[in-house]
Amino acid sequence: MVKYSQEPGNPTKSAKAMGRDLRVHFKNTRETAFALRKLPLTKAKRYLEDVIAHKQAIPFRRYCGGVGRTAQAKSRHSNGQGRWPVKSARFILDLLKNAESNADVKGLDVDNLYVSHIQVNQAQKQRRRTYRAHGRINPYMSSPCHIELILSEKEEPVKKEADNIVAARKQ
């Protein structure tokens, strides 16, 4: 059994998916995942497809050193720094589709799902080497990551009773 960092509040109304040791940049994937937090599933999938087509940008908030500015990122409530991490978007889109099919098998309403939890962790770095001048060798590392996400059904809030009924009961 794979351990998730957070268990859903209602496991019967949730679907999970996880990817381990994925060969995709950690920093780009973290920013992509943060942009999807609390989005409905249909909007999240459409947003990632737009990122792949370069129609919408992912705003870079934490790992934004040297990242250029674009109007597409400014419209997503950031300072304007953003990119289009296509590979990260494809990996997360595949995981969203996996979690959606898991929800379908569980019998959940797919149109009512939203991304309740998404997290990206660093995986163990993979080492390669590059040869430099004067016989030196430098490391050539990759930064893979683990991605976990949970889709949950929106909880319908309990409707408040009308005031006139409450007043009638008090008398």
From Swiss-Prot:
HAMAP family recorded for this chain?
Answer: Ribosomal_uL22_A (MF_01331_A)
**Family annotation (NCBIfam families):** PRK04223.1, uL22_arch_euk
Q: What does the record list as GO biological process?
A: cytoplasmic translation
The similarity annotation says: Belongs to the universal ribosomal protein uL22 family.
Top-level division of the source organism's lineage: Eukaryota
Which molecular-function annotations from GO does this UniProt entry contain? structural constituent of ribosome
Q: Any idea which UniProt keywords this protein has?
A: Ribonucleoprotein, Ribosomal protein
Q: Name one Pfam family in it.
A: Ribosomal_L22
Q: Name one GO cellular component term.
A: cytosolic large ribosomal subunit
Protein's UniProt name: Large ribosomal subunit protein uL22
Q: Please give the InterPro entries that the UniProt record associates with this protein.
A: Ribosomal_uL22, Ribosomal_uL22_CS, Ribosomal_uL22_euk/arc, Ribosomal_uL22_sf
Residue ranges annotated as transmembrane are: none
Under the heading Gene3D superfamilies, the entry gives: Ribosomal protein L22/L17 (3.90.470.10)
